[in-house]
């Protein structure tokens, strides 16, 4: 595992959920998962999605923790980065993911539209499907 958080790939909520459910592309995510981190905001998105689908909150938390992701805090500097994306109509969760990916240098998502919106500002967005 790479101890330098600033160079570790960031998974968005769609990536975490794909791993949990064995969705298409999960095999690509498994290859980088040991080094990946998840922003606390995106972890909250994952838990909210699981609970909204009927899973008890404690079970959702246990399912997330079973993946052994390091969950990183959403820091004030990242809030400033995420604010740059608000005019593009991007959701809060996606803005927080993009800020974390920009800080760390790469991110994994299923949302191909994110890469086209920002003119390459995020150094390396990877798409798992």
Indicate residue ranges for each PLM-predicted region:
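Acidic, PIN/NYN-like endoribonuclease modules and their adjacent C-terminal/linker elements
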Residues: 1-4, 98-129
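A generic structural signal for short hydrophobic patches within well-formed alpha-helices
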Residues: 16-17, 43, 114-115
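Alpha-helix C-terminal capping segments
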Residues: 27-34, 64-67, 82-86, 99-103, ...
């Amino acid at each position: 595992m790479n101890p330098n958080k600033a160079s570790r790939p960031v998974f968005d909520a769609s990536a975490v959920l794909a791993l949990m459910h064995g969705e298409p592309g999960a095999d690509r995510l498994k290859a980088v998962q040991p080094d990946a981190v998840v922003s606390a905001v995106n972890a909250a998105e994952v838990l909210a999605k699981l609970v909204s689908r009927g899973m008890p909150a404690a079970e959702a938390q246990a399912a997330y923790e079973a993946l052994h992701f390091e969950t990183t805090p959403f820091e004030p500097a990242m809030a400033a980065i995420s604010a740059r994306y608000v005019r593009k109509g991007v959701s809060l969760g996606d803005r927080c993911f993009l800020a974390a990916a920009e800080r760390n240098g790469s991110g994994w998502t299923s949302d191909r539209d994110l890469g086209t919106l920002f003119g390459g500002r995020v150094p390396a967005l990877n798409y798992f499907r």
